[in-house]
Amino acid sequence: SGGKKIKVDKPLGLGGGLTVDIDA
């Protein structure tokens, strides 16, 4: 991949973690 990983804790207060792996 070689992209960047974005770690977001409780996005928009959904009560959960979100890990987005962008292949840029």
Curated annotation (Swiss-Prot):
GO cellular component, one term: photosystem II
Gene: PSBR
Lineage: Eukaryota, Viridiplantae, Streptophyta, Embryophyta, Tracheophyta
Protein name (record): Photosystem II 10 kDa polypeptide
Signal sequence range: none
Positions of disulphide bridges: none
GO annotation, biological process: photosynthesis
Chief localization: plastid
Compartmental location: Plastid, Chloroplast thylakoid membrane
Keyword terms of this UniProt record: Chloroplast, Membrane, Photosynthesis, Photosystem II, Plastid, Thylakoid
Superkingdom field: Eukaryota
Family classification: Belongs to the psbR family.
Organism of origin: Triticum aestivum (Wheat)
Function: Associated with the oxygen-evolving complex of photosystem II.
